[in-house]
Amino acid sequence: MASNFVKLGSQFIGKLTRVTSLPAHHTDLVQRVSILKDELLTIGNSKEKFQNVLDQKGQWLFRTYRDGAGILELMDQLFPRHYLALQVLEWRRGQKDYCIPLTSEEYAKGIKIAGRARDINLAVYLFDEAAKKRMQTASVYNSLMSVYMWNGLAEECQSLFKDFRRQTHCAPTVVTYNILVSVYGRLLMVKNMEAAFEELQKVKLPPNSVTYNFLIAGYMTAWNWDKMEATFQEMKRGPVEPDTDTYQLMLRGYANSGNLNRMEEMYEVIKDQVGVNSGPLVRAMICAYCKKAVEDRVQKIENLLSLLSGEEYLPWLNVLLIRLYAQEDFVEAMESKINEAFEQKTCVNKSSIMRAIIAAYFRCNEVDNLANFVKRAESAGWKLCRSLYHCKIMMYGSQKRFEEMEGVVNEMAETNYGLVTKTFAIMIKAYKNHGMESDAEKVKGKMLKRGL
């Protein structure tokens, strides 16, 4: 569950740690930095060339913008390439000839990026360096706390928070408490999460939408649907109104809890906004529909699937759709997804999925399709089961295809499943249904020989 919270929390983390305050003419800055960034990206992995370009064309970043805005903008633009952004900071820390010290915001940004790069040691080193230079501002503390949050280090985060509270030159902010709420929520430490929220209120720092969103996400991760709903209703009543992130969280929460009516109501509220980042939400709704047999669920799911067009193949989603179509007896659609799974070399190892496929073929009387599927599934390493063979025996028997029925029995005898009482009972019933009493008696004789 904690991994799910990472996905939920990532959309808010930027709000917690973005400390840059660009000048009014930042548009020109962004354009100039973009040109430099593009040149740096063409260099590749040569650290020496990277540093040389900055030496020749990057001095203006901190000489013109002594508040750190230039370096911060370049690090922001290189943020997807964490190691390059950190190289910029390393170069900046080495520029000592101009007597322009790093700002606390540059340290905060470096700490944040080091955390995203999972380099906790570097983040702590930068924090300690800032401390030696008396630059331990709230943003620097918050950045290191967010590093611990991002990496699930609750004890370290709490220890740093206690140190933060002892400082006389700076004090925790609402961002600080948001981080605490987040880290506890991610680790299912609900009581600690609630205690952090209560302390925020005691120190009379007004919570913001991010605070409530992290609370909702924490309750959702812990599957505490009642408190999730109560927090949402509190937002609707209080001074902090729900934002887009809140509605998306609630949509996911309703989907995960199987509350389809509320999920659909929430989707109507935000469906025009579900687009660029629709994937996780849409997939959550698809999962919710797959778990409950509701009217028109196939049509609803296919409408949602149209929003995912162009996305990469997801094995788990494809298997989920195989089971859905099997349960609804949509054999053609089921086989389309099965073929896709074979093409993508997806290996199904759940008996429940196989039984759903078998049942669909049985209800639709598609024994030849079933036989073909079994051959392909066996070659692809899918998990076979005894029910699969029994279904083939039953279907061949119902169609008076006794030679093929007996062929399946012989095939089954050579597998690890072997022949059991039920196998013979199915054969006996098949023969009797068609008035072939003597053949049924022969099968009974075989049973006796096997001691069944």
UniProtKB/Swiss-Prot annotation:
Pfam families: PPR, PPR_2. One of its GO terms (molecular function) is mRNA binding. Keywords: Repeat. It comes from the Eukaryota. Gene3D superfamilies: Tetratricopeptide repeat domain. PPR repeats lie at residues 137-171, 173-207, 208-242, 243-273, 350-384, 385-419, 420-452. The keyword Transferase does not apply. NCBIfam families: PPR (TIGR00756). Belongs to the PPR family. P subfamily. This is Pentatricopeptide repeat-containing protein At2g30780.
